[in-house]
């Protein structure tokens, strides 16, 4: 028994290396099988396609306004992003990512910050400079009532006065005196009459068939020709010179009636309105009156104004109704027209109210004449005058004015060509803007002497041209 056990142990010991070898081989086979299966599984697994590389860089996308860091998942689920954003905001765990800035944007922001800094510094320096004490050469009317000193109140008032004066260049007329000084008394008209152009002498309208057309009011030529013997007529247009100059030339081509032309450029701009300020005309306001269709245009000197209804382009005789009053006004020895104009109730209907007054005076005058004619004493003193009633004084003035108008128009018709040449020869000004700026303007007497000298030179030149024309006519 013991022998059998020993023999089996010996046999087992001899077979032990073989068994160990078989076990090692089986383990190797199993390992190779597992590794091969894993490799096969990995090879059979589909590969994800790689995203294509774009030729657009992040800088280019940022310049175009595209957020390069935003993925497709963010675009697919905007609701989830909003929910997540609110959660993060409430918890304070996260912050929004700043968009990436390009180098150009960074430089642009830097230059903008520098610009803001220099601008604020310049504005502050300008404000301090404008609130300084008054200089000796600053106008007296600008610093009127404001003293020097560096208290906050005085500095603010000086700053405001200087700041407001910057805009007077655009609000005031181009010159303080729009007209030259009036001629000496022998050559001066007693009164100055300022007249509008638009909707008083002319009316412009646009139609689809004809476009823009301008109509001249009936009686315009007679109105200007008749009153030019009494008044210095100034035509003050409410449009700019570039639009109205040609119309004025058509209205008075030889400049026989209108003395001066003014336009919208010469108005005062105040409270959003262009105002015709008579104080800039270099004329006595007591001897100046203006007719206009817009009350806002004469609001600074309403006591000098006669308001007219705008003309709508239809034929009327409204211009002729102004002549009796204007003729009466200029033929009376008055020093100020404003009290007479203020005596009328309505400035829109002065011609009608004046006509009523004249009729009352005429009736009273005729009654007095009849009473005088019926008395025997007047018949004995002057029998010839008793049979001929006296004329109303205003009728005598009108008859004399008509005679002068006829003579004047006849002279213009005869001398039309001469007047055109004279206008071209004497259109040169007697002084320049440099003379006005330097204060070297000639006196009215000196200007009249210059005009007379030009007139003399023109007469000599015209006589020579006339003789040449006569010789050429005889030669033919």
Swiss-Prot record:
<feature type="topological domain" description="Mitochondrial intermembrane">
    <location>
        <begin position="131"/>
        <end position="476"/>
    </location>
</feature>
<dbReference type="InterPro" id="IPR050365">
    <property type="entry name" value="TIM50"/>
</dbReference>
<feature type="topological domain" description="Mitochondrial matrix">
    <location>
        <begin position="10"/>
        <end position="110"/>
    </location>
</feature>
<feature type="compositionally biased region" description="Basic and acidic residues">
    <location>
        <begin position="40"/>
        <end position="50"/>
    </location>
</feature>
<dbReference type="InterPro" id="IPR023214">
    <property type="entry name" value="HAD_sf"/>
</dbReference>
<keyword id="KW-0811">Translocation</keyword>
<feature type="region of interest" description="Disordered">
    <location>
        <begin position="40"/>
        <end position="103"/>
    </location>
</feature>
<comment type="function">
    <text>Essential component of the TIM23 complex, a complex that mediates the translocation of transit peptide-containing proteins across the mitochondrial inner membrane. Required to direct preproteins in transit and direct them to the channel protein TIM23, and possibly facilitates transfer of the translocating proteins from the TOM complex to the TIM23 complex.</text>
</comment>
<keyword id="KW-0809">Transit peptide</keyword>
<keyword id="KW-0472">Membrane</keyword>
<feature type="domain" description="FCP1 homology">
    <location>
        <begin position="186"/>
        <end position="329"/>
    </location>
</feature>
<dbReference type="GO" id="GO:0042802">
    <property type="term" value="F:identical protein binding"/>
</dbReference>
<dbReference type="InterPro" id="IPR036412">
    <property type="entry name" value="HAD-like_sf"/>
</dbReference>
<keyword id="KW-0812">Transmembrane</keyword>
<comment type="subunit">
    <text>Component of the TIM23 complex, at least composed of TIM23, TIM17, TIM50 and TIM21. Interacts with preproteins in transit.</text>
</comment>
<dbReference type="GO" id="GO:0046902">
    <property type="term" value="P:regulation of mitochondrial membrane permeability"/>
</dbReference>
<dbReference type="GO" id="GO:0008320">
    <property type="term" value="F:protein transmembrane transporter activity"/>
</dbReference>
<feature type="transmembrane region" description="Helical">
    <location>
        <begin position="111"/>
        <end position="130"/>
    </location>
</feature>
<keyword id="KW-1133">Transmembrane helix</keyword>
<dbReference type="GO" id="GO:0005744">
    <property type="term" value="C:TIM23 mitochondrial import inner membrane translocase complex"/>
</dbReference>
<protein>
    <recommendedName>
        <fullName>Mitochondrial import inner membrane translocase subunit TIM50</fullName>
    </recommendedName>
</protein>
<feature type="transit peptide" description="Mitochondrion">
    <location>
        <begin position="1"/>
        <end position="9"/>
    </location>
</feature>
<keyword id="KW-0496">Mitochondrion</keyword>
<keyword id="KW-0813">Transport</keyword>
<dbReference type="Pfam" id="PF03031">
    <property type="entry name" value="NIF"/>
</dbReference>
<dbReference type="GO" id="GO:0030150">
    <property type="term" value="P:protein import into mitochondrial matrix"/>
</dbReference>
<comment type="similarity">
    <text>Belongs to the TIM50 family.</text>
</comment>
<feature type="compositionally biased region" description="Basic and acidic residues">
    <location>
        <begin position="66"/>
        <end position="85"/>
    </location>
</feature>
<keyword id="KW-0653">Protein transport</keyword>
<dbReference type="InterPro" id="IPR004274">
    <property type="entry name" value="FCP1_dom"/>
</dbReference>
<keyword id="KW-0999">Mitochondrion inner membrane</keyword>
<feature type="region of interest" description="Disordered">
    <location>
        <begin position="435"/>
        <end position="455"/>
    </location>
</feature>
<dbReference type="GO" id="GO:0030943">
    <property type="term" value="F:mitochondrion targeting sequence binding"/>
</dbReference>
């Amino acid at each position: 028994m013991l022998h059998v056990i020993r023999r089996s142990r010996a046999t087992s010991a001899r077979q032990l290396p073989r068994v160990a070898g078989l076990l090692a081989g089986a383990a190797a086979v199993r390992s190779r099988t597992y590794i091969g299966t894993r490799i096969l599984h990995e090879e059979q697994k589909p590969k994800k396609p790689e995203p294509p590389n774009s030729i657009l860089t992040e800088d280019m996308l940022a310049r175009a306004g595209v957020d390069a860091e935003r993925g497709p998942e963010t675009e697919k689920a905007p609701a989830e992003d909003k929910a997540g954003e609110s959660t993060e905001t409430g918890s304070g765990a996260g912050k929004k990512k700043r968009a990436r800035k390009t180098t150009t944007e960074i430089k642009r922001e830097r230059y903008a910050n520098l610009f803001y800094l220099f601008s604020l510094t310049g504005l502050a320096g300008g404000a301090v400079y404008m609130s300084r004490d008054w200089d000796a050469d600053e106008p007296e009317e600008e610093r009127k009532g404001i003293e020097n000193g560096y208290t906050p109140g005085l500095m603010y008032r000086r700053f405001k006065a200087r700041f407001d004066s910057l805009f007077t260049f655009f609000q005031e007329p181009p010159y303080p005196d729009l007209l030259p000084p009036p001629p000496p008394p022998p050559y001066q008209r007693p009164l100055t009459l300022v007249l509008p152009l638009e909707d008083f002498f002319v009316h412009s309208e646009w139609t689809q068939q004809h476009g823009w057309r301008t109509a001249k009011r009936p009686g315009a030529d007679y109105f200007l020709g008749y009153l030019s013997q009494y008044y210095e007529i100034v035509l003050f247009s409410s449009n700019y010179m570039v639009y109205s100059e040609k119309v004025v030339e058509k209205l008075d081509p030889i400049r026989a009636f209108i003395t001066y032309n003014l336009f919208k450029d010469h108005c005062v701009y105040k409270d959003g309105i262009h105002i015709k300020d008579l104080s800039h005309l270099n004329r006595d306001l007591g001897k100046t009156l203006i007719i206009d269709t817009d009350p806002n245009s004469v609001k600074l000197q309403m006591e000098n104004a006669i308001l007219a209804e705008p003309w709508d382009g239809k034929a009327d005789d409204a211009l002729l109704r102004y002549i009796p009053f204007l003729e009466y006004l200029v033929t009376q020895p008055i020093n100020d027209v404003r009290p007479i104009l203020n005596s009328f109730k309505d400035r829109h209907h002065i011609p009608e109210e004046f006509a009523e007054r004249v009729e009352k005076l005429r009736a009273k005058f005729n009654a007095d004449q009849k009473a005088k004619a019926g008395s025997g004493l007047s018949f004995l003193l002057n029998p010839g005058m008793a049979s001929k009633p006296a004329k109303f004084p205003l009728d005598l003035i009108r008859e004399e004015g008509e005679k002068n108008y006829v003579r004047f128009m006849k002279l213009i018709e005869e001398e039309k060509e001469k007047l055109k040449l004279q206008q071209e020869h004497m259109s040169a000004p007697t002084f320049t803007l440099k003379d006005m700026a330097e204060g070297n303007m000639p006196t009215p007497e000196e200007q009249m002497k210059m005009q007379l000298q030009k007139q003399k030179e023109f007469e000599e030149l015209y006589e020579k041209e006339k003789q040449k024309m006569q010789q050429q006519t005889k030669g033919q």
